[in-house]
Amino acid sequence: MVELSSEVPATPSLPADLPAVLVQIPVYNEPAVVERALEAAAALDWPRDLLTIQLLDDSNDLTTDIAVHAVSRLRARGLTVDHVRRADRSGFKAGALAAGLARCDAPFVAVFDADFVPPSDWLRRAMAALLAAPRAAFVQSRIEWGNGEANWLTRAQRLMQDAHFAVEQDTRFRRAVPFQFNGTGGIWRRAAVEEAGGWSHDTLSEDLDLVLRTHLAGWGGVFLMEPAVVGELPQRLDDFRVQQSRWSKGFVQVARKLLGPIWRSTWSTEAKIATTVSLCTQGIFPVVAIGLICLAISVVGHGGLAAGFRAALWIWFAGMLVILIGMTWGAYRRLNRGGAARYLVTAASVPVLICYLALANADQDGNEIGRAHV
């Protein structure tokens, strides 16, 4: 694995001769956001003769009609926009991205899910960072959440996502160990994608799969705290559960596929352990749920639990609190989310949410989880 330096210049300069860039927007039945996504891509500050926008439209509802009119308007303004329709949804998002790549030879490929909106200067800043690191396969931006204040659920999710980006992703990048491409808000170097074997749809986490395969091929990545890309969080528990269940299944699939090659690779021990921990993180939900249930039993009349076991439960609980606060408080302050009281209220909902996910996932009937783009 290449040891990329994390010391990317704060404002790296772009070369005089800019490369061609392809912007891919995969969409499936998202009529409320497809036009906004196209307009955001069109507003990116990049020479028009070097920018191609692909709408990878697998929809079977009115999304396609809205897209046809939006694409027509953008073409009338002089932009190159390719509205890609497939005969079937084979490979789902990964299949759509691969099909789009086959239609354009641009050396750099930005990917945005339809409900994510980049600022107009995002492409110039992200490309500058990527070009400054010749062995970087991709650049990933932090994601800001436009509906983070919608309700208690989005506030709890934002707290966890802030910890993921501002602590986990940033630390992994600075430590030169593999970190995630989050499926949106980033740019791929085509040469790295092709060397790693391209997009694969044999897991539900095609982005994580590709990241690890590029690292195994000797590439690295760049993480940017700024500029952030604005996205949306699930506002309903059912939507959140489906999203998290899909991610959990995808992580397990990637672990089965790649942990062997990772541990047989020449990566550092730190990188191997960090990646293994990341792939196994989804297992924390049932562990925390069981631990909290046992703790509750021990509080109510000791529940017949041995004194030593009760003591161990409290030590475990204290350790979990330290991890939760350590991961979330720093990110909360770094991103100026508010005061301590507001933080405590939001943080208190996280264990409840984890228990809900563990119980909800255990209750699933084993049917394949519906595919989505985020």
Predicted segment positions?
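A conserved acidic beta->alpha catalytic loop
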Residues: 47, 57-67, 88-90
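Long helical/loop segments within the catalytic core of UDP-sugar-dependent glycosyltransferases
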Residues: 71-108, 120-204, 215-216, 237-276, ...
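The conserved acidic donor/metal-binding loop of glycosyltransferases
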Residues: 59, 113-117, 202
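N-proximal low-complexity "stem/linker" segments adjacent to membrane-targeting elements
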Residues: 1-39
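Cell-envelope/extracellular polymer assembly enzymes that use nucleotide-activated donors
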Residues: 19-22, 52, 194, 209
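Membrane-embedded multi-pass helical conduit in multi-pass membrane proteins
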Residues: 13, 281-371
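Short, acidic, metal-binding catalytic loop of nucleotide-sugar glycosyltransferases
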Residues: 39-50
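Catalytic donor-sugar/metal-binding loop of nucleotide-sugar-dependent glycosyltransferases
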Residues: 202, 211-230
